[in-house]
Amino acid sequence: MALYEHVFLARQDLSQQQVDALVEQYKGVISANGGSVGRVENWGLKSLTYRVNKNRKAYYTLMDLNCPPAALNEMERQMGLSEDVLRFLTIKVEAHEEGPSAMMQKREERSERGSFGDRDRGDRGPRSFGDRDRGDRGDRPPRSFGDAGGDRGPRRPREGFEGGAE
């Protein structure tokens, strides 16, 4: 039997219990056809990069499969017919990864880091908003209103043009 990693996206308007029921349904399909399901990870409701069937978000689920190709084909056929499954992707692997997937590790790192305001700013010191009125780094002198700036000097008047701003 071959080893596969299978990810599918379920509609955003489903509840977590309905997504779990889908997982159980597809586990049953794999076991009925002589395969087994290892790790199952629910990555939760995540934003999609672009709309898929009028959905901006979807429930992501990863399944590690050990099954014959016929079992996988049957599961993918049923997913294609289901209105609850937006997309799915199956990849054949040499061996299943031990421990949590990269997506779950990212989630754990985020929870350890805390919110934006808690992050360490290193040698920059605490963030202050009092110097934001000029919008520069503070290493240049302020410009006066009519100053052209740079090395160009004043602008010469246009030839052959009557009137103007001068």
From Swiss-Prot:
- Family designation: Belongs to the bacterial ribosomal protein bS6 family.
GO MF entries: small ribosomal subunit rRNA binding; structural constituent of ribosome
* Listed GO biological process terms: translation
Q: Gene3D superfamilies in the record, alphabetically?
A: 3.30.70.60
Comp. bias regions, Basic and acidic residues: 96-142, 149-166
Q: Disordered: where is this region? A: 96-166
Q: Which residues form a coiled coil?
A: none
Give the InterPro entries listed for this entry: Ribosomal_bS6, Ribosomal_bS6_sf, Ribosomal_S6_plastid/chlpt, Transl_elong_EF1B/ribsomal_bS6
Keyword set includes Disulfide bond: no
Which segment of the chain is annotated as a signal peptide? none
Role of this protein: Binds together with bS18 to 16S ribosomal RNA.
Query: Which cellular components does GO assign to this protein?
Result: cytosolic small ribosomal subunit
SUPFAM superfamilies in the cross-refs: Ribosomal protein S6
Name of the gene encoding the protein in the UniProt record:
rpsF
- Kindly provide the name given to this protein in its UniProt entry: Small ribosomal subunit protein bS6
Which terms are listed as keywords in the entry?
Ribonucleoprotein, Ribosomal protein, RNA-binding, rRNA-binding
CDD domains, A to Z = bS6
